[in-house]
Regions:
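Extracytoplasmic/periplasmic copper-protein system
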Residues: 1-11, 15, 50-91, 95, ...
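Intrinsic, low-complexity N-terminal interaction/targeting segments
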Residues: 148-149
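Surface-exposed loops/turns
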Residues: 26, 37-38, 97-98, 154, ...
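Short strand-edge motifs at loop-to-beta-strand transitions and within beta-strands
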Residues: 28-34, 156-162, 191
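Short edge beta-strand/loop segments characteristic of extracellular beta-sandwich folds
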Residues: 102-108
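Beta-strand signatures of extracellular beta-sandwich domains
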Residues: 114-118
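Aromatic/His-enriched, Gly/Pro-containing loop or helix-boundary segments
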Residues: 12-28
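A short tyrosine-centered beta-strand micro-motif
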Residues: 39-45, 101, 164-173
Length: 196
């Protein structure tokens, strides 16, 4: 399992995306709510190191067993913002306002997607992110990622909670495309929104 998942690019066909919280900056935390079926799971990190290699390829992976239970499984909690992921974009209803929100994320697409929520400078677009990625991710990223969920398959639903201050934000998907292996952001899967 460890060796197969360390290979860059899409996961092997036998590995099923389960989602989870997206990466957290040093000293911070991230959250996600999901329902796990009994089975074997791997927690891993695909975030690139300064040398361009993923943390996963350097060994950042941990196996986990989810045991069956005879207790009823709790229902997925609701949220106040519905977010759709599609090939290659995002939808949000209603538009976010300042404050703490729980995003209910549904993959409405034909392939896996993720959502990375980033804080941007006022008036910033997503072009600096694309340039940073195409330039080999040299230096710090052009915004501060702080919330979201990792890859979920078509039809999967997960939640995450984030506190939004007034400002400019971006949504990005870095999942490798099923067709050409390029990150979905290169296919236009990024957008900005403003919170007032």
């Amino acid at each position: 399992l460890n060796e197969a998942l360390k290979v860059e690019g899409p996961p092997p066909a036998w590995a099923v995306n389960a989602g989870g919280p997206n990466g957290a900056l040093p000293g911070s935390s991230a959250n996600a709510t999901l329902v796990l079926e009994p089975g074997t799971y791997a927690m891993l990190c695909r975030i690139p190191s300064p040398d361009g290699k993923s943390h996963l390829s350097k060994g950042m992976i941990l196996g986990m067993e989810v045991q069956p239970t005879t207790e009823p499984v709790a229902a997925m909690p609701g949220g106040d913002i519905q977010m759709g992921l599609f090939d290659y974009g995002f939808s949000m209803t209603p538009p976010p306002t300042a404050g703490t929100h729980t995003f209910v994320v549904t993959n409405q697409a034909q392939q896996p997607h993720e959502v990375v929520l980033v804080r941007l400078e006022a008036g910033q677009t997503m072009e600096p992110w694309t340039a940073w990625l195409k330039g080999g991710m040299q230096g710090p990223p052009p915004g501060m990622p702080f919330a979201g969920i990792t890859d979920i398959n078509p039809g999967q639903v997960q939640n995450f909670t984030a506190e939004l201050a007034p400002g400019t934000y971006g949504l990005i998907c870095f999942v490798p495309d099923a067709g050409d292996g390029q990150p979905h952001v290169f296919h236009g899967m990024s957008t900005t929104f403003t919170v007032s």
